[in-house]
């Protein structure tokens, strides 16, 4: 799954969602 990073962010390999005022570099989705 995703790793929460900040209040409204999740980020992990192959996973990213809402940015927290800055942009995350995201890998292609692995579903």
Curated annotation (Swiss-Prot):
Q: Where is this site: Hydrophobic/aromatic residue important for potent activity?
A: 8
Q: In which tissues is it expressed?
A: Confined to the epidermis and to the mucus layer.
Transmembrane regions listed in the UniProt entry: none
Family, per the entry? Answer: Belongs to the nemertide family.
**Note in the entry:** Negative results: does not show effect on rat Nav1.8/SCN10A.
Q: What does this protein do?
A: Potent toxin, demonstrating strong inhibitory effects on insect sodium channels (Nav) and reduced activity on mammalian sodium channels. Potently inhibits inactivation of insect sodium channels of B.germanica (BgNav1) (EC(50)=11.1 nM). Also delays the inactivation of most mammalian Nav (human Nav1.1/SCN1A; EC(50)=92 nM, rat Nav1.2/SCN2A; EC(50)=134.2 nM, rat Nav1.3/SCN3A; EC(50)=12.9 nM, rat Nav1.4/SCN4A; EC(50)=14.6 nM, human Nav1.5/SCN5A; EC(50)=27.8 nM, mouse Nav1.6/SCN8A; EC(50)=123.6 nM, human Nav1.9/SCN9A; EC(50)=80.5 nM).
- Give the protein's recorded name: Nemertide alpha-4
Native organism = Lineus sanguineus (Ribbon worm)
